[in-house]
Amino acid sequence: MDITKSLNCRELRDCDVVDSDGQKVGRINDMTFTFDGQLKLEQFVLAGSAWEEFLESIKIKPDRDPLFDASMIRRIGDKVQLESNVNTLKTTLDKGAIPKGEIRWSELSKKQIVDLEEVTIGKAIDIDFDIDGTASLTVGGGMIEETLEKIGLKDDIDIIVPAETIDSIGDQIKLKVSKDELKLTMDQALENPEVRAVKDSRDVHRGVVKVRLFHKPR
């Protein structure tokens, strides 16, 4: 899978999905992930009129969730390009289409994030995909939102926490680090020149700057 730029779930949901024949299949409505020390994208859930028309043509109710595996993706850029055509896709009618252990983004985004002592940190407001394919949490709410509001950058900064800092995902997302450690790391990251430049050009700045915590060069 070739990822041409860093992007997130929010941006992916705006992308058209095109099959190997160049046919527009629909748009991404949801995604599934697994976690085993790394957050791994597994499947996409589609929506859109083109897909619904196809389901109707093969006598399947269009309210079922069509899926395709992440391994079927050739390239992600302005569009999501698939290796296969629409006829090879599956739906949640298929037994085991979403295996046990996979979790939908729509469910993950409702979970609270807690530190190693189970103190609430905030929520996962998005998942960020770097060009090397690694996935990380974009964290908001709670102390994250409070800190960004204090410096007037709530809408200008995304705080990215790598999957390596996640201990487990169950009823909540538990981190391996403490709230104080996270806060200290974030405060240090917000002092970098790129963030200061956002502060100085707030009136003309239009993009969102991604601030990666606990970042280790690859």
Regions found by a protein language model. Name each.
Residues 1-218:
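Peripheral interaction segments used for macromolecular assembly
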